[in-house]
């Protein structure tokens, strides 16, 4: 009887174990990029197709400018949010955040307005001013 019970419990646990996935801790991921990358964190519901496309196009079409500024694009759209353990500051919030080398939010918008100002915001940062003088990268 005990043997049958053990087998039954084992069989019941296998599907549960195979469906479990490890979530990405967003705070830890952001912290792993400290002092290496500036981050644009983009969180959107899937229904905001225009917002998603505009943001994706910005990063695709401006790769040189983004690379020159050490920008890392973290894109979380729709159900992808379930893959993450979200820090309190982003729970139930949507939009776009510019996160500095220090891991702090530098700017936020709930539309594409941040993309229009992002280079100006970054280029005014003290560390970026130093980077500009040291960089040889020229983008067209």
Residue map of PLM features:
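Repetitive helical segments and hydrophobic/amphipathic motifs
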Residues: 11-12
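Non-catalytic interaction/Regulatory regions outside core domains
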Residues: 2-5, 16-140
């Amino acid at each position: 009887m005990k043997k049958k019970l053990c087998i039954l419990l084992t069989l019941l646990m296998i599907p549960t174990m195979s469906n479990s996935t490890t979530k990405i801790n967003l705070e830890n991921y952001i912290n792993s990029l400290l002092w290496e990358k500036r981050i644009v964190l983009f969180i959107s519901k899937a229904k905001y197709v225009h917002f998603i496309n505009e943001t994706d196009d910005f990063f695709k079409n401006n790769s040189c400018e983004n690379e020159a500024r050490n920008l890392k694009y973290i894109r979380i759209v729709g159900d992808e949010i379930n893959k993450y353990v979200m820090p309190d500051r982003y729970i139930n919030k949507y939009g776009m955040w510019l996160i500095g080398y220090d891991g702090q939010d530098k700017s936020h918008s709930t539309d594409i307005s941040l993309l229009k100002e992002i280079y100006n915001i970054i280029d005014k940062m003290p560390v970026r001013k130093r980077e500009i003088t040291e960089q040889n990268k020229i983008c067209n």
